[in-house]
Amino acid sequence: MQNCYTLRPDRGKNVTYLIRATFWYGNYDGKNQTPTFDLYIDVNYWATVSSPIYFYEEITYVSQADDIQVCLVNTGNGVPFISALELRPLDDDISPSGLRFLQLHWRYDIGRSLNYSLRYPDDVYDRIWEAKNYKKWIILNTTSAIDLSVNDDEYKYKIPGEVLRTAQGPMNASSPLELWWLSIGQNKWIVYFYFVEIERLTRGQQREFTISMNDNQFRETVSLEYLKPVVVVSTPVNGWNITFSIESTNKSGKPPILNAVEFYTIGDLPNVPTAQDDVKAINDIKAMYHIKRESWQGDPCVPSKYTWDGLTCSYGNPPRIILA
């Protein structure tokens, strides 16, 4: 059984959105037993929800139809619930070409004081930036205004200036910045690195470094200018975990820094929605005859185990309703 929320943004299909589902159980039902259930975006699996504390699942998603369905699927381990559901339009070029479903794992404002987060109105996309300090790194910051008038190709990401005013670097100037995270399973990762030179260097000095990830599956060299943002988006990187190193080049007179970072995995979209003409027709029938069957939520045919009661579907590309 599934319960679905239908989002109808004005911009319609083939548009990039941030979608965030927030959950806070709080023992609202008095059972003191956190339910476990699945979350679907349109006709594809998004995540499994199981947490007694406040948390959220967030994706960057390119809409496949005029409507977007977010469904809570009962898997027999308690009644699904949701505390908030948000949708924000993004620049269509913010995701690497061809990637329609990115699932956020971490988004960090590096060098910021702990117990601090930043979102709208500072971030026009309403991304939530969590403060992160690494004890083995030194903190750098500036009160100067970040130059956000860089070219459109860089600034489609619209990262807030406040996020870029802090950074961290290595304790030892000759050491790289190194981090690793362990994943639950084999994934394809995309990482967004954000940099700004926030230290006024002396004439002739330069901060240049090379980013490498997962045994050089991705590698890129970056040179910074004072107060001008640089965004580096990795190519897809495979692995059970993710490691990266940011190391100064031989001609750099300064150690590497990192201002902010986002980690995503590439989501799978194996299922194709039911033909839109069929969906419109069956929803018109549903409205005309005031049909209130419990199963008539979400996509009529897909996933096949949640096909609406009373319908027969064919499973070509796309699936079609052949009997109602």
Residue ranges and their predicted role:
Residues 1-314, 320-324:
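Compositionally biased, intrinsically disordered or flexible polar/acidic segments
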